[in-house]
């Protein structure tokens, strides 16, 4: 069962149009966010984790490329 949906955002909280599948495994979403960041040429972004049930923000994860 999918518990979270993800949104990739810049540090100014503007959304990038990156397709990160819904799911329940955050590590997989982070890996997909990094792949999208490489494609978009972004070095640092925020991965927002939202609840499927309430649509509330549960976590904001800073993602950086090495």
Q: Which residues does each PLM region occupy?
A:
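Short aromatic-glycine-(Arg/Gly/Cys) micro-motifs in beta-strand/loop hairpins
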Residues: 1-18
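Surface-exposed loop/edge segments in extracytoplasmic proteins
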Residues: 13-20, 54-60
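A short, charged, amphipathic alpha-helix used as a generic interaction element across diverse proteins
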Residues: 19, 23-44
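Short, mixed-charge low-complexity intrinsically disordered segments
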Residues: 37-66
């Amino acid at each position: 069962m999918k518990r979270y949906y993800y949104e990739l955002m810049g540090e100014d909280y503007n959304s990038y149009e990156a397709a990160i599948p819904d799911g329940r495994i955050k590590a997989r979403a982070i890996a997909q966010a990094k792949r999208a960041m490489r494609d978009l040429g972004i070095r640092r972004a925020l991965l927002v984790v939202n609840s499927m049930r309430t649509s509330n923000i549960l976590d904001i994860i800073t993602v950086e490329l090495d």
